[in-house]
């Protein structure tokens, strides 16, 4: 796995699923392939994206700044600086300075990542802020190691939270989760169907599913009534794809 592939993997792991994630993935691919060289436009685009947390925007902004060549005097962006200030906690800043001193002596990606993993996410964000604000300089590989360590910590906590929700025994939460998943699956079906003539059937199935979810929410239904809803939808989607000559088995 190449260094940039690894960085892309870690960064995308903290971006919520949805159309925006696909857009960000495309931007990262373009940046890493040297196709997108307008840092100013890229940062303006990132700043106005909805849904993303300030920290995720800060990390993405840091990645773009490290990767896209730019004029030396290019202004640093406030939304990135604010996200990478470690919540203004002086303890985070103290730890960030100690971490920076270690990273300054480290030239490899994996070495930097190993060192960074022993620090809290707040200290890691502050350390990124130091480098972003040109208060310190490390090798690009070390900076990428720092980014990936931060993403790993964030992804770990997201995974713990997700696992708690998935394994909850509360039937109301499970019911709502199934309906949300069915609704997002229906939305994905509508987007994938596009405008081809054969798409009408898939669009119809997706539309009916979304109407059903809306009705279930409006009138209130038994928590078990949503069981299997998402899987039914996915089976419909796979049947449609088969007829279109597309084989995608890894949705479930």
Curated annotation (Swiss-Prot):
One of its GO terms (molecular function) is RNA binding. It comes from the Viruses. It is a peripheral membrane protein. SMART domains: Flu_M1_C (SM00759). The keyword Kinase does not apply. The keyword Membrane applies. Residues 1-164 are annotated as: Membrane-binding. SUPFAM superfamilies: Influenza virus matrix protein M1 (SSF48145). One of its GO terms (cellular component) is membrane. Pfam families: Flu_M1, Flu_M1_C. A motif (Nuclear localization signal) lies at residues 101-105. Keywords: Host nucleus, Membrane, RNA-binding, Viral matrix protein, Virion. Residues 165-252 are annotated as: RNP-binding. One of its GO terms (biological process) is viral budding from plasma membrane. It is found in: Virion membrane; Host nucleus. Plays critical roles in virus replication, from virus entry and uncoating to assembly and budding of the virus particle. M1 binding to ribonucleocapsids (RNPs) in nucleus seems to inhibit viral transcription. Interaction of viral NEP with M1-RNP is thought to promote nuclear export of the complex, which is targeted to the virion assembly site at the apical plasma membrane in polarized epithelial cells. Interactions with NA and HA may bring M1, a non-raft-associated protein, into lipid rafts. Forms a continuous shell on the inner side of the lipid bilayer in virion, where it binds the RNP. Determines the virion's shape: spherical or filamentous. Clinical isolates of influenza are characterized by the presence of significant proportion of filamentous virions, whereas after multiple passage on eggs or cell culture, virions have only spherical morphology. Filamentous virions are thought to be important to infect neighboring cells, and spherical virions more suited to spread through aerosol between hosts organisms. Belongs to the influenza viruses Matrix protein M1 family. Most abundant protein in virion. When expressed alone can form virus-like particles in transfected cells. Homodimer and homomultimer. Interacts with NEP. Binds ribonucleocapsid by both interacting with genomic RNA and NP protein. May interact with HA and NA. Cannot bind NP without genomic RNA. This is Matrix protein 1. It comes from Influenza A virus (strain A/USSR/90/1977 H1N1). The gene is M.
């Amino acid at each position: 796995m190449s260094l940039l592939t690894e960085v892309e993997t870690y960064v995308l792991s903290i971006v919520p699923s949805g159309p925006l994630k696909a857009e960000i993935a495309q931007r990262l691919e373009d940046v890493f392939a040297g196709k997108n060289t307008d840092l100013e436009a890229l940062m303006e685009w990132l700043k106005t994206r909805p849904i993303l947390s300030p920290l995720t925007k800060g990390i993405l902004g840091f990645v773009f700044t490290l990767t896209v060549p730019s004029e030396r005097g290019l202004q640093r962006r406030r939304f990135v600086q604010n996200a990478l200030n470690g919540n203004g906690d002086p303890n985070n800043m103290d730890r960030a300075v100690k971490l920076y001193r270690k990273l300054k002596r480290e030239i490899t990606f994996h070495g930097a990542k190993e060192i960074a993993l022993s620090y809290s996410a707040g200290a890691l964000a502050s350390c990124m802020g130091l480098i972003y604000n040109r208060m310190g300089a490390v090798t690009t590989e070390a900076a990428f190691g720092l980014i990936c360590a931060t993403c790993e910590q964030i992804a770990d906590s997201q995974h713990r939270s997700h696992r708690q929700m998935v394994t909850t025994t509360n039937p109301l939460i499970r019911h709502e989760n199934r309906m949300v998943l069915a609704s997002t699956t229906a939305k994905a079906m509508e987007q994938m169907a596009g405008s081809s003539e054969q798409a009408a059937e898939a669009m119809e199935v997706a539309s009916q599913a979304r109407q059903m979810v809306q009705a279930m929410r409006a009138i209130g239904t038994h928590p078990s009534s949503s069981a299997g809803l998402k899987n039914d939808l996915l089976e419909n989607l796979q049947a449609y794809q088969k007829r279109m000559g597309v084989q995608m088995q890894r949705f479930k």
